[in-house]
């Protein structure tokens, strides 16, 4: 049989495979979502509230996180839009994990938990120290002292997870690569379509904030050489002399 010129619908939230072998993402906001939701539909919340202009025709409010703003026209092409949506969700999830990983060890260290190095951008260099990395004093993690071993584990484990996500599982069953469900949803958070639609919005809102936070952490590391919590403590102790403007006017790269 041939699929030429036809679109095969695989699952309610899965991509459509078209005859030209290109993928287009179907909307993930279920039709059963209440029309009263403030995050979906033509009457959804806009980026400037009541002062927002008319959104582009291709931003109809069917996807989570659509506030009707696309000055650069990045979402005008459906295929590019589908790809960017997937990239945003994946980067949001990594950013949320990364932001937690940057702050939590430093928080524990400031409360008496001993680390070899708690500041996120300095921790990796400890592998070159005489004692190597200190995983909370656990001697069973000796293999994590090897850069090659760490690299190999990252390639194998992350490659397997990404391959599983994109291919739809080890048996090749088709799932939504952004919201795979099934064994990835052991708590059944997606069972209620309306609750699931709201969770998608919350995930993107928190993910976008986390991406900005990670950008701020990188800038802080370059400019101050300190972790985020230490920078926060310095600012609270002396907000006049420890703020973005003060550092921007005195910052000399490389010094």
UniProtKB/Swiss-Prot annotation:
Record keywords, A-Z: Acetylation, Chlorophyll, Chloroplast, Chromophore, Magnesium, Membrane, Metal-binding, Phosphoprotein, Photosynthesis, Photosystem I, Photosystem II, Plastid, Thylakoid, Transit peptide, Transmembrane, Transmembrane helix
Entry keyword Repeat: no
Binding-site positions, chlorophyll b 2: 93, 142, 171
Domain of life of the organism encoding this protein: Eukaryota
GO BP: any one term: photosynthesis, light harvesting
N2-acetylarginine PTM sites in chain numbering: 26
Binding site for chlorophyll b 4: 154, 165
Annotated positions binding chlorophyll b 5: 154, 251
Chain residues that bind chlorophyll a 1: 69, 75, 88, 208
Residues modified to Phosphothreonine: 28
Binding site for chlorophyll a 6: 235, 244
Topological type in the membrane: Multi-pass membrane protein
Entry binding sites for chlorophyll a 2: 91
Residue sites binding chlorophyll a 5 per the record: 202, 220
Function: The light-harvesting complex (LHC) functions as a light receptor, it captures and delivers excitation energy to photosystems with which it is closely associated.
Record note on quaternary structure: The LHC complex consists of chlorophyll a-b binding proteins.
Designated name of the protein: Chlorophyll a-b binding protein of LHCII type I, chloroplastic
Organism encoding this protein: Cucumis sativus (Cucumber)
Lineage: Eukaryota, Viridiplantae, Streptophyta, Embryophyta, Tracheophyta
